[in-house]
Amino acid sequence: SYPITPATDILHELAKHKSLGVKTVQCEDEIAGCASAVGAAFAGALAVTTTSGPGVCLKSEAMNLAVIGELPLVIVNVQRGGPSTGLPTKSEQTDLLQALYGRNGESPMPVIAATSPTNCFDAAYMACKIALEHMTPVVLLTDAFVANGSAAWKLPNLNEYPAINPPYVTPDMAGNWTPYQRNEETLSLIHISEPT
């Protein structure tokens, strides 16, 4: 990601969790932030990039690359007020149409919106599940109020969440599988071996 108010804290928090295998990159601009996430997705990672309204404009071409490449990518848009650079510390929920239609070629993309600080985990989990299982980028909308808010939150039991089952290429497919090969039930398969 590239630091942009009010989304920067997500990058800061994720950077604290390298011991859990989280990899973070602070890029030189919004375009590089999304393009590097697309590269990570192409390499088989669950990729996430964070931004706010003006950054989504800059990321749109790379987001479309993930659409056409059928790559799992989560784009977190922490919305802020106003057009253009806007008001970075003012909370608004004004990027819904941008999230739904803000790309050329009418490329579709699922959109999920978090409703509160306590709902963010569930919304992020579902965004990742949809991205990985359906090989598509997903936009996760939140806003400055939610991003800067806090609430009592009970750590969830992950066993109670629906399993995430990405369509990996299996070892028995080696030699007779191509990245553009269609699957009868879905679009394409993740072209790396399933993690062990």
Model region roles, listed by residue range:
Residues 181-185:
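A glycine-rich, hydrophobic/aromatic-adjacent loop/helix-cap motif
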Residues 12-17, 150-161:
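Short glycine/threonine-rich loop-to-helix capping motif typified by GTGT followed
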Residues 6-7, 55, 82, 141-155:
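A glycine-rich phosphate-binding loop feature that marks nucleotide/adenosyl-phosphate handling sites
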